[in-house]
A protein has these predicted regions:
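A cross-family kinase active-site recognition segment
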Residues: 112-170, 192
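Active-site Asp-x-Gly
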Residues: 193-194, 206-251
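Helix-rich C-terminal or lid/interface subdomains of diverse kinases
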Residues: 241-293
Length: 293
């Protein structure tokens, strides 16, 4: 579903540059004149190149390296060949990656769907994720470790200009709990396997055939519990054999990462700024309650 126009006024200025780059890439790819309709504003921007059946995924060229984007497309093609419920790279034209006006862009088949809204939707998403995990076996290697997420957080926290709106005391709080949680994780033996890497419900669409997972740029190797930790607790039962204590630990680490990333990107939109504030408050509440027990 495209974002309503009234939400676009709060979006940071570079969005217009991204949309212009998407139009240029669409023309270069042979799609003719298109009108990008915003589907998702996150750390990447996803647009439908209307009226074509193609979507574009856009990020800053400094974020999306050629090698990383090519790996994402390669993994996506592997998943498509296995019949996995995932988005597919454009096949009638070159999927890219393209680099235009400081933006890195890949092209995908457009999927019309809606976000999960009910407990039943969550279960369907979890079951589809199981199929993705099965199809990821034999995915092109090497894949990065899931710990690159933690490294990214540490770099942002140690470089205040990357998250300048974050209060210094809050920065110390996040650095402290990030260090403590990573130390706890280092004491555990982990069974590693290929994962989606960012399996929260914002990265899945419900379509008529079923749930479809997207945003495959964080595919990695890690414990199954890393993907499960992205899901609501009621979905954990769909993954028998997981260690719930490990899921809870990784859920806490993931919340730290999401909080840091939101603060680093808090000028992207009012939604991102609100999410940054909300995630930080949830972490403070969570760790305050742990200290009092």
């Amino acid at each position: 579903m495209a974002l309503p126009p009234e939400q676009l006024s709060a979006v940071r200025q570079p969005l217009e540059r991204e949309l212009a780059a998407a139009r240029e890439v669409a023309a270069r790819a042979g799609l003719g004149q298109t009108e990008p309709k915003i589907l998702k504003l996150a750390h990447h921007t996803t647009v439908h190149l209307s009226p074509t059946p193609i979507a574009a995924r856009i990020c800053g060229a400094s974020i999306g390296s050629d090698a990383k984007l090519r790996r994402e497309l390669q993994v996506a093609r592997h998943l498509a060949s296995r019949g996995a419920p995932t988005v597919r790279p454009a096949s009638t034209i070159s999927a890219g990656p393209y680099f235009e006006n400081g933006c890195a862009i890949t092209l995908w088949e457009f999927v019309s769907g809606r976000p999960p809204e009910t407990a039943a939707d969550t279960m369907r998403a979890a079951q589809a994720l199981q199929r993705v995990h099965t199809a990821l076996q034999g995915a092109p290697r090497p894949l990065p470790s899931f710990t690159v997420a933690f490294d990214s957080c540490e770099r942002i926290l140690s470089n205040p200009p990357q998250s300048e709106l974050l209060d210094s005391s809050d920065r110390v709080f996040l650095q402290t709990i990030n260090t403590e949680l990573r130390e706890q994780l280092s004491r555990r033996e982990l069974d590693l396997r290929p994962l989606h890497g960012d399996a929260h419900l914002g990265n899945v669409l419900l379509t008529n055939p079923g749930a479809v997972w997207m945003d495959l740029d964080d595919v990695c190797t890690g414990p199954l519990e890393w993907d499960v930790a992205c899901l609501p607790g009621e979905a954990w039962a769909e993954f028998p054999g997981i260690y719930r204590e490990l899921v809870q630990l990784l859920n806490a680490l993931r919340r730290v990462c999401v909080t840091v990333w939101c603060w680093a990107d808090s000028d992207r939109s009012s939604e991102t700024r609100e999410a940054a504030i909300d995630h930080l408050q949830q972490l403070k509440t969570r760790f305050a309650s742990q200290e009092s027990t």
